[in-house]
Amino acid sequence: MGTYAIQLAKRSNIHPIIAVAGKAQEHVQSMLDASKGDAIVDYRKGDEAVVQGIKDALQGRKLLHAFDATAASNSVLNLCKVVDTEDDARITLVLGPEGDVGGQHTEIPTSVQQSLSNVFDVHGTQAELGYVYSRYFTRGLQEGWFRPQKQEECAGGLEGVEDALKKLKDGSASATKFVFKIADTPGAGSSR
């Protein structure tokens, strides 16, 4: 999700983009523009390094807008340490707190506006927005300014799920979406 947010921010000329990534740094770096202040911070170096990396990338500017595409580990807490608490800052997250997917993160200061944004919204109250986005993404794909993540087709259809899960678990897959062709599953489509 983060790579899509980066592409939309770039398209809107929103800079600097300060991205936090791990093994996918090379992929993320290819989307950033250092001449506009964009930077990448490695989350594998720990929370203190993430906070300091964001501060360094800000170069004294205030952080007023943040999009947390993971809401994992301490990402919300790290953002709370760098987001400005006095000037109408906003954090958008893709997940609520653990155990309360649609809830509010209590660790975010009350002076900072928080909102949740996820795909479920387009199946309800945001259906019209979902339609517009789908058309806009299609246009971006056609024009080349919007790119999908790298995909890897897994051999054997659904029999390839185990291998894909192993790659995710051992960390050998990063910034990759796995594709399983159901028709390639042994026995698929046959009647018994």
Region annotations inferred by a language model:
Residues 1-192:
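Terminal helix/beta-alpha structural elements that buttress the NAD(P)+-binding lobe
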